[in-house]
């Protein structure tokens, strides 16, 4: 398993994909999959089934993991 320089809470810039150019905070690092979850990037709508907890069901927006190679540390952050 490789060691990554990007940690939870770091400010990163997306360098590839639909969110290219965005600067945001890392919410979670998934080292085994070499992926990160970045706040407000790669957002998808997930369907929620009807249940006791959620009687109406519906949709929820959620950030999905992206490859760690698609982000770099933002300039000026150490």
Curated annotation (Swiss-Prot):
Gene this chain is encoded by: rplX
Q: What is one Gene Ontology biological process annotated in the Swiss-Prot or TrEMBL record?
A: translation
Name of the molecule in the record: Large ribosomal subunit protein uL24
Any one Pfam family match given in the protein's UniProt record, by short name: KOW
**Gene Ontology CC entries for this record:** ribonucleoprotein complex; ribosome
Species, as recorded: Helicobacter hepaticus (strain ATCC 51449 / 3B1)
**GO molecular function, one example?**
rRNA binding
Coiled-coil intervals, chain numbering: none
Record text on subunit structure and interactions: Part of the 50S ribosomal subunit.
Q: Does the keyword Ribonucleoprotein apply?
A: yes
The UniProt function text for this chain reads:
One of two assembly initiator proteins, it binds directly to the 5'-end of the 23S rRNA, where it nucleates assembly of the 50S subunit. One of the proteins that surrounds the polypeptide exit tunnel on the outside of the subunit.
């Amino acid at each position: 398993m490789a060691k990554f320089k990007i940690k939870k809470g770091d400010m990163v810039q997306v360098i590839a994909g639909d969110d290219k150019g965005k600067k945001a905070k890392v919410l979670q690092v998934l080292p085994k999959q070499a992926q990160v979850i970045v706040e407000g990037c790669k957002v998808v709508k997930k369907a929620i089934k009807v249940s006791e907890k959620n009687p109406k069901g519906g949709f929820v927006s959620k950030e999905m993991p992206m490859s760690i190679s698609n982000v770099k540390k933002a300039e000026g952050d150490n």
